[in-house]
């Protein structure tokens, strides 16, 4: 009897230990290694969403945007935040936030692409997988474009760090990178759904519409001027400000941009809002989307990605204002830029804030030397901020008006003068600016040079303070000339 009890006890203990072992061997629900993440399409989607964090960042609209004909920084030259704006060359002038954030997202894209391509799926899950792959290609291309815009020739990798044969990399010729990311975007536009298909619920993710616009933008930058040098020697004497040496390459790139814009325009899904102000009121209010015009916007929400949009680059609001909360603008509009707008251009008083707000909520006029950036206004928000420095204001990375102006620019180049389609695209942007009154938009230029100069001006008026002016001027080889003119005025 004792032996029977003993055997039962031993068996019971064995079962318990076995159960305990099985319990301890249960997979972790929070495990985030590649095998776990890419075990289902829903988990894989979460990984893809994480890739978007590096497509835009504060350094892009602050440190790297100042110092043009549009705006300037109020910080002193002894402050590292202002070095890039004032073209002070030292180790601290580099806006490292762009570099580290972009490469972080690129690594996530590379890891996702490897994981997604290894998944074995069928039906709707397989379709989703292909779309997520296209998303990652488009996000990675966007990150590399930002790196090239600010740093020129940079390290270029399309595989995860764990798969690299070396952890060090020299600079790669930007033309090689451009070829790679243009090919990625061309692959992406074939797979991504149009926004109207409803696959994406907000323009915070890249639809086919947005991918075409990003492709056009990338092609125009690839065709533009840039500072090239010998990447074998890094000899400063080899520095040249030039376009790609092969004119046929330049023409091919303009053709890519032209056709990408044409694809968006001919689809007919996108349009301009009737009022310019409504674009930015919606962005400031939060949770209001206008995908017909704002084709791709950077989501600013939560404790990890939320930025200072409107705090650092908006209206000046008194610290004691209880309704809107304090702001501390460190960027101001040049008086010359404000005065360059036509008086009846409705974009002027949206782009430029010619008042501040006192503690009681009253508007106080400011002098020309203290003109604020007007597109980002905390008094346009629908509710309170997440915190003083967290405003929940999304950033417009791509708008339809940009697509129209890129199309006009490409058509002008390819035809040695503006086509009727180029003029129509240009005039569509102008008409909205002047409240639909065709008699106020002026005569549209008809020669290559005059139309190009009109595009240069119109992009300044339409896209001011949205992060493109400085690098637009570089790709046109107009930065030095424009800065000299601004300083003289």
Residues covered by each model-derived region:
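Bacterial N-terminal signal peptides that target proteins for export
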Residues: 1-8
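Membrane-proximal, proline-rich intrinsically disordered regions
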Residues: 20-66, 237-238, 280
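Bacterial Sec-dependent N-terminal signal peptides
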Residues: 4, 13-40, 181, 216, ...
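Short, surface-exposed recognition loops and adjoining beta-strand edges that mediate ligand/DNA contacts
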Residues: 61-74, 193-210, 224-315, 436-450, ...
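TPR/Sel1-like alpha-solenoid repeat signature
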Residues: 212-218
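Conserved, well-structured interaction surfaces
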Residues: 40-57, 78-151, 165-201, 373-395, ...
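Short coil/turn linking the two alpha-helices of tandem helical-hairpin repeats
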Residues: 148-150, 155, 196, 221-230, ...
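Elongated scaffold/linker segments in the mid-to-C-terminal portions of large proteins
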Residues: 42-43, 48, 52, 56, ...
């Amino acid at each position: 009897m004792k032996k029977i009890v003993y055997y039962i006890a031993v068996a019971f203990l064995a079962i318990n230990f076995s159960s305990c072992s099985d319990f301890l061997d249960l997979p972790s629900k929070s495990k985030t290694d590649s095998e776990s993440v890419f075990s289902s399409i829903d988990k894989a989607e979460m990984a893809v969403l994480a890739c978007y964090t590096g497509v835009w960042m504060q350094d892009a609209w602050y440190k790297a945007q100042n110092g043009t004909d549009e705006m300037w920084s109020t910080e002193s030259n002894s402050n590292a935040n202002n070095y890039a704006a004032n073209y002070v060359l030292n180790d601290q002038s580099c806006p490292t936030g762009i570099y580290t954030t972009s490469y972080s997202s690129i690594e996530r894209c590379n890891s996702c692409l490897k994981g997604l391509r290894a998944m074995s799926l069928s039906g709707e899950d397989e379709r989703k997988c292909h779309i997520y792959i296209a998303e990652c290609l488009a996000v990675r291309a966007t990150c590399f474009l930002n790196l090239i815009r600010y740093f020129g020739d940079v390290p270029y990798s399309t595989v995860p760090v764990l798969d690299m044969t070396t952890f060090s990399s020299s600079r790669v010729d930007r033309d090689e990178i451009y070829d790679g990311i243009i090919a990625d975007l061309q692959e992406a536009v074939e797979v991504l759904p149009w926004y109207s298909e409803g696959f994406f619920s907000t323009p915070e993710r890249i639809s086919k519409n947005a991918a075409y616009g990003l492709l056009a933008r990338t092609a125009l930058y690839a065709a533009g001027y840039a500072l090239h040098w010998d990447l074998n020697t890094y000899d400063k004497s080899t520095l040249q400000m030039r376009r790609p040496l092969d004119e046929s390459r330049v023409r091919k790139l303009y053709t890519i941009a032209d056709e990408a814009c044409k694809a968006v325009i001919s689809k007919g899904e996108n349009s301009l809002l009737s009022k310019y102000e409504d674009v930015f009121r919606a962005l400031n209010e939060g949770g209001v989307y206008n995908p017909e015009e704002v084709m791709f916007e950077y989501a600013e929400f939560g404790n990890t990605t939320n930025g200072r949009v409107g705090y650092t680059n908006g209206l000046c609001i008194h610290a004691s204002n209880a309704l809107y909360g304090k702001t501390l603008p460190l960027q101001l509009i040049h008086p010359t830029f404000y005065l360059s707008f036509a008086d009846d251009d409705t974009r002027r008083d949206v782009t430029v804030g010619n008042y501040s707000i006192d503690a009681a909520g009253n508007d106080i006029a400011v002098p020309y030397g203290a003109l604020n950036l007007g597109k980002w206004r905390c008094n346009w928000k629908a509710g309170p901020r997440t915190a003083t420095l967290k405003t929940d204001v999304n950033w417009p990375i791509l708008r339809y008006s940009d697509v129209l102006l890129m199309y006009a620019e490409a058509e002008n180049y390819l035809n040695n003068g503006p086509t009727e389609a180029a003029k129509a695209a240009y005039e569509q942007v102008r008409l909205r600016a002047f409240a639909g009154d065709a008699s106020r938009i002026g005569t549209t230029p008809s020669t290559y040079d005059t139309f190009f100069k009109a595009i240069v001006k119109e992009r300044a008026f339409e896209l001011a303070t949205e992060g493109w002016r400085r690098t637009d001027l570089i790709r046109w080889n107009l930065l030095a000339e424009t800065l000299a003119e601004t300083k003289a005025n």
